[in-house]
Amino acid sequence: MSELDQLRQEAEQLKNQIRDARKACADATLAQITANIDPVGRIQMRTRRTLRGHLAKIYAMHWGTDSRLLVSASQDGKLIIWDSYTTNKVHAIPLRSSWVMTCAYAPSGNYVACGGLDNICPIYNLKTREGNVRVSRELAGHTGYLSCCRFLDDNQIITSSGDTTCALWDIETGQQTTTFTGHTGDVMSLSLAPDSRCFVSGACDASAKLWDVREGMCRQTFTGHESDINAICFFPNGNAFATGSDDATCRLFDLRADQELMVYSHDNIICGITSVAFSKSGRLLLAGYDDFNCNVWDTLKADRAGVLAGHDNRVSCLGVTDDGMAVATGSWDSFLKIWN
């Protein structure tokens, strides 16, 4: 037997040991434990604002920490900063590449970033002395498209890429300080833990991984999806996360139990999920779908509690405000809608 075969065998044995250990931990299901909890009831949200101004498909949006301003990125080659209270555009930033896939608002509110098919992550300073928005740094280093980016602070940002890696950047120097390798497919999405010490990533290898930001190590790998994971989002307490996939399911994974807790699916739902987000308490899971709808799931019961219907094309992105008071959805119909 060749050395490679021996190693393969060893890896299989280790995988089986992990599977058995996980089974031993799974002494109850989430459905059993939440059986006595009242259902959340029918969730009916209304469109409170429609943000009009983009001229093409919207691909991404991200709320600022003030729960008022948000940034959106569109195929029209613009980043727009919106005031969600008044629907006014605070800034419209022309991009060098219109093939944008992600955008992010820094926690401080001083910067926004975006990225896409040009493999570069430009950082824009919103608070210049002159009052104009300008590129403060362009982060180049990925060898594939940028699928997602999230600021840790004004000088650090994490990116995920189609080159199968994630990276932590020092914005001032423009250098990758850590590269997170381990996925075997395009990384599509990332979500920072509430304490910012770790993050999760979802990829086209149908797995999700938990990473330690400072050590650059993969801590855990979660499998279960049958197709690409397009979206990922941490549970508000940081102990679990949800994923959305092309296999038409959302799933809830628990870090401490090291396994899947729940599947959110319905026989009538046969299209992929583009985006996921939790309500402030975590009781509701919102998911955007290719069929133009956004479904609201009861996280504990896996029942569908409501639908946000109003877009005329695929819901490509969604986000819940930090204060938990509103949801924004962005769509290929070129509009953003604010619901509550």
Curated annotation (Swiss-Prot):
Keywords, in A-Z order: Repeat, Transducer, WD repeat
One matching Pfam family: WD40_Gbeta
Gene Ontology cellular-component annotations: cytoplasm; heterotrimeric G-protein complex
Gene Ontology terms describing biological process: G protein-coupled receptor signaling pathway
InterPro entries for the chain: G-protein_beta_WD-40_rep, Gprotein_B, Guanine_nucleotide-bd_bsu, WD40/YVTN_repeat-like_dom_sf, WD40_repeat_CS, WD40_repeat_dom_sf, WD40_rpt
GO molecular function, one term: signaling receptor complex adaptor activity
SUPFAM superfamilies for this protein: WD40 repeat-like (SSF50978)
Spans of repeat WD: 53-83, 95-125, 141-170, 182-212, 224-254, 268-298, 310-340
Family in the record: Belongs to the WD repeat G protein beta family.
Protein name: Guanine nucleotide-binding protein G(I)/G(S)/G(T) subunit beta-1
Source species: Xenopus laevis
